[in-house]
């Protein structure tokens, strides 16, 4: 039976493996710390799905208050189901749990950024009722090599 629960720092190795499936580089050296930070943050939720003790999926949610509209929104930050466990309803279960959490927090919408190459994920989100929205623009704040900021 597939169940969901809040993640714990002990889930770090399995979550790191799932993030690798999303083409994120090795997260093993910091993932446990990041999980603990997210779990302590009041506007974050980290859910996992498991079956017979094996962690098969992860869903990271961020609740964002809004200024100009009454309802807040929930952003799916990371969402992955183990590639060998897909099409078993795990993603649908996690997304449904996430939606229930968002509604309980007063959110009136959910959003997800999904890379253009993830066509299977796009089909999943469309089936769950998501629609495309306006383009997002991003600015990297990573070190760009400018010497002026270094001490």
Predicted segments with their positions:
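Residues at alpha-helix boundaries and the short loops/turns that link adjacent helices
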Residues: 21-25, 88, 131
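Conserved N-terminal entry element of GNAT/NAT acetyltransferase domains
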Residues: 1-10, 143-151
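A short, internal acetyl-CoA/4′-phosphopantetheine-binding micro-motif in the GNAT/acyltransferase core
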Residues: 79-86
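Conserved acetyl-CoA-binding loop-helix of GNAT-fold acetyltransferases
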Residues: 87-100, 127
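Conserved GNAT acetyl-CoA-binding A-motif
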Residues: 95, 102-114
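Acetyl-CoA-dependent GNAT
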Residues: 9-71, 77, 97, 140-141
């Amino acid at each position: 039976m597939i169940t969901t629960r809040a993640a714990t720092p002990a889930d770090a190795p399995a979550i790191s493996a799932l993030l690798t499936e999303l083409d994120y580089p090795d997260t093993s050296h910091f993932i446990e710390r990041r999980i603990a930070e997210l779990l302590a943050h009041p506007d974050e939720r980290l859910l996992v799905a498991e079956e017979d003790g094996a962690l098969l999926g992860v869903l990271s949610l961020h609740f964002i208050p809004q200024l100009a509209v009454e309802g807040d929104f929930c952003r799916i930050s990371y969402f992955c189901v183990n590639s060998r466990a897909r099409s078993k309803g795990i993603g649908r279960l996690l997304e449904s749990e996430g939606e229930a959490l968002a509604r309980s927090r007063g959110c009136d919408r959910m959003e997800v950024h999904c890379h253009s190459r993830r066509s299977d994920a796009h089909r999943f989100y469309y089936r769950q009722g998501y629609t495309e929205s306006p383009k997002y623009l991003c600015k990297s704040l990573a070190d760009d090599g400018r010497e002026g900021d270094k001490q």
